[in-house]
């Protein structure tokens, strides 16, 4: 038999081993049932790890999370929305609007160079030699879409003003083509320029003698492309035809006390 001192040391060593085992078990329970040896988890795949997490070696995983703006970044969302809206408006303004109601206006186009008005004749000729109030100078302007794009036709002949591939102004009975669509551009001098929608950079223009000029030789700053909208002689809009109605109310006077206001009868 050993000495009592050796037996006591063996007992203490046995108690220490039991305490260590209890600590290991409690740690394993806290990690959960799927947690095992840390050395075993290093060899497992990365499918259970969250996106964007880095490994111990410092390398990214195969499928990182996309870089979406945070929910709280209001400035980023506000900067993206106007760009999307502008792109949508620009794309839709280039397409004929088949759903909205057409806005039809009637007026004359006064040429800055010739000093007269644009007219569409029955022989399909177009010039700027009409006087004010001429029936062939009365034009009907139809909206094509919301991007200031219009179709212009003569009210007397029903022919549309179009432009061919050579830049020459021609008259057509069917104005559904893009060559019969013009974009209204309001200039700084308050004149209006009409740019063809099919041939960008080509404008409706007339010389001093009222003859049409080729669109390929026109620029926006030239006087030949400047027009002014004028109502036909004797033509009034709905707003101008309306008259104000004045109602005769009795005059406003004070009573004798001065604290209350009364209506005095109107003198006859």
Swiss-Prot record:
Matches recorded under CDD domains: beta-trefoil_FGF8
Family matches, as SMART domains: FGF
Basic and acidic residues biased stretches: 71-80
Tissue expression profile of the protein: Absent in normal mammary glands and detected only in adult testis and ovary and in midgestational embryos.
Keywords annotated in UniProt: Developmental protein, Differentiation, Glycoprotein, Growth factor, Mitogen, Pyrrolidone carboxylic acid, Secreted, Signal
Pfam families named among the record's database cross-references: FGF (PF00167)
Residues annotated as signal peptide: 1-22
SUPFAM superfamilies: Cytokine
Main location (coarse class): secreted
Post-translational modification: The N-terminus is blocked.
Gene Ontology molecular-function annotations: chemoattractant activity; growth factor activity
Chain positions carrying an annotated carbohydrate: 60, 190
CC per GO annotation: external side of plasma membrane; extracellular region
Signals that turn on the gene: By androgens.
Compartments where located: Secreted
One GO BP annotation of this record: dopaminergic neuron differentiation
Disordered, as annotated region: 29-87
Modified residues (Pyrrolidone carboxylic acid): 23
Family stated for the protein in its record: Belongs to the heparin-binding growth factors family.
Primary role: Plays an important role in the regulation of embryonic development, cell proliferation, cell differentiation and cell migration. Required for normal brain, eye, ear and limb development during embryogenesis. Required for normal development of the gonadotropin-releasing hormone (GnRH) neuronal system. Plays a role in neurite outgrowth in hippocampal cells. Cooperates with Wnt-1 in mouse mammary tumor virus-induced murine mammary tumorigenesis.
Binding partners and assembly: Monomer. Homodimer. Interacts with FGFR1, FGFR2, FGFR3 and FGFR4. Affinity between fibroblast growth factors (FGFs) and their receptors is increased by heparan sulfate glycosaminoglycans that function as coreceptors.
Name of this protein: Fibroblast growth factor 8
Natural source organism: Mus musculus (Mouse)
């Amino acid at each position: 038999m050993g000495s009592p001192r050796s037996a006591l040391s063996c007992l203490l060593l046995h108690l220490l081993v039991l305490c260590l085992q209890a600590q290991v078990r409690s740690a394993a329970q806290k990690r959960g049932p799927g947690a095992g040896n840390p050395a075993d988890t290093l060899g497992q795949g990365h499918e259970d790890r969250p996106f964007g997490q880095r490994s111990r070696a410092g390398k990214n995983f195969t499928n990182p999370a996309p870089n979406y703006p945070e929910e709280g970044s209001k400035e980023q969302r506000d900067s993206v929305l106007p760009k999307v809206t502008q792109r949508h408006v620009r794309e839709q303004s280039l397409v004929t609007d088949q759903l909205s109601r057409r806005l039809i206006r009637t007026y004359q186009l006064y040429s800055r160079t010739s000093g007269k008005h644009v007219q569409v004749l029955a022989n399909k000729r177009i010039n700027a030699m009409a006087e004010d109030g001429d029936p062939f100078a009365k034009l009907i302007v139809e909206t094509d879409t919301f991007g200031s794009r219009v179709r212009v036709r003569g009210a007397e002949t029903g022919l549309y003003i179009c432009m061919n591939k050579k830049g020459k102004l021609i008259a057509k009975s069917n104005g559904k083509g893009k060559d019969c669509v013009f974009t209204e551009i309001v200039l700084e001098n308050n004149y209006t320029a009409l740019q063809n929608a099919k041939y960008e950079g080509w404008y409706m223009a007339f010389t001093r003698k009222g003859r049409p000029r080729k669109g390929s030789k026109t620029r926006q700053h030239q006087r030949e492309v400047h027009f002014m909208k004028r109502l036909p002689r004797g033509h009034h809009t709905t707003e101008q035809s309306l008259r104000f109605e004045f109602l005769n109310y009795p005059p406003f006077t004070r009573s004798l006390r001065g604290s209350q206001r009364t209506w005095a009868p109107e003198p006859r």
